[in-house]
């Protein structure tokens, strides 16, 4: 039973407000003596022309209280207390019967959502900054899919632009072919960094780079062959990383795919009277929207990524007819998205409102922001290796007899990195701290994974839940707090969708793990003399393990059975 829905439907019979809006304002009170659910009455004051306190008192007298232990008003709030035995039975039985499907719904059925994420630049390393958008987008895909949306995962590769002209120039001057095939990304990075250092001394190199890119745009054989080589080698390396972190895509269609669709965009904008010439470049003026012009074509005739994004948006609408198109791209690109989406709107595409930029912060180390150009980049592969190695050392110290130490270290080490990215709101910057990240205590990935392993250990030791379960035995504060947390899973998923924020799930699973460990530390289940109570607690442990596993899967983390 969805208690919030029941409350919303009953309030709807008394107050003129639709069920969906009511559902959204129902809260979980901060204190236990305030009930299990609370409805604030402030929003009804204007419509009913009464004080919120008076409304709460009046509604409380009229509402159908069946199925609740009690309903009472406290100031401007109506507090609902559930029947604990019924609540425990309904929640735990739902989890145990639905298992991997617990939390799933059909709210998104019939709706198509595109999610563009990761989108690394070809010939540049996949560094720790790229991982943020990659795991964020992958998690959004899993969360939307869980609720029935038909999702398409797009990796909009950065495989076009003037940087490829620079890279071709650098390749011709300084590339070591043996090094290129041995470690393509590192060699391409080396020559790219060298190009920029040399260009500081010889500005004509920049002109040479632009010339090579123009030749690439014109389809010149040698330049196209080199560009294809860079792309194939880069993609091979990127896929190694994606395999490590369990990330997949339905499409790798990058910027280059839209290069032959640029002229049509220019023509469309011109026909609609939106195109203006400025210093030789073709732009869409956005002064009245307090934005700089959106450049469509540069003075040298080369296209820019805003134009390619316009072409991609139109192509995707025609191809997929999406209901929502999500762009998971760093906050640094916020202005670009405002310009591009405003241009799309001005071109008469009302569906531009369905295109959403989901921004995220920076990843920082002691040295500050990461940058490819200067070469001070931390490779993601190195970060993952170090995390797995450090985790292995911790596990060796804590449990030297553990089987499958290598696999456990890999899952926990990589999981710890992903968890760190998705723990807080996506717009916040991330600062890596190994000690905190790999700790088995506190709000970390290893802590949550250890909670799951602890639950599985109890189940292995005590066996399966037997026959009919006496849920009325689960009356303690620790037991009921855990049951309430388990009940909140679907609400957390819907909240994550509403806010486009996977950290909602991460924070949720932290709270489940905390509630589970509080319960675990309060009671020695194996020594419980009351067999009915022991069986009920065993059912609760199994339900907790299922929910922790399901929640972790939504943020892309694999569980381990032992730690």
Curated annotation (Swiss-Prot):
MF term (GO), any: ATP binding
Q: Pfam families this protein is in?
A: Arg_tRNA_synt_N (PF03485), DALR_1 (PF05746), tRNA-synt_1d (PF00750)
Q: Which organism is it from?
A: Clostridium acetobutylicum (strain ATCC 824 / DSM 792 / JCM 1419 / IAM 19013 / LMG 5710 / NBRC 13948 / NRRL B-527 / VKM B-1787 / 2291 / W)
Which keywords does UniProt give here?
A: Aminoacyl-tRNA synthetase, ATP-binding, Cytoplasm, Ligase, Nucleotide-binding, Protein biosynthesis
Mainly localized where? Answer: cytoplasm
- Give start-end ranges for motif 'HIGH' region: 120-130
Q: According to the entry, what is the taxonomic lineage of the organism?
A: Bacteria, Bacillati, Bacillota, Clostridia, Eubacteriales
Q: Which family does it belong to?
A: Belongs to the class-I aminoacyl-tRNA synthetase family.
Q: Where in the cell is it found?
A: Cytoplasm
Q: How does it assemble?
A: Monomer.
Catalyzed reactions per annotation: tRNA(Arg) + L-arginine + ATP = L-arginyl-tRNA(Arg) + AMP + diphosphate
InterPro entries associated with the record: aa-tRNA-synth_I_CS, Arg-tRNA-ligase, Arg-tRNA-synth_N, Arg-tRNA-synth_N_sf, ArgRS_core, DALR_anticod-bd, Rossmann-like_a/b/a_fold, tRNAsynth_Ia_anticodon-bd
Q: What Enzyme Commission number(s) appear in the record?
A: 6.1.1.19
Q: Name one GO cellular component term.
A: cytoplasm
> Which domain of life does the protein's organism represent?
Bacteria
Do you know which SUPFAM superfamilies this protein is assigned to?
Anticodon-binding domain of a subclass of class I aminoacyl-tRNA synthetases (SSF47323), Arginyl-tRNA synthetase (ArgRS), N-terminal 'additional' domain (SSF55190), Nucleotidylyl transferase (SSF52374)
Q: What is this protein called?
A: Arginine--tRNA ligase
**EC class name:** ligase
GO BP, sorted A to Z: arginyl-tRNA aminoacylation
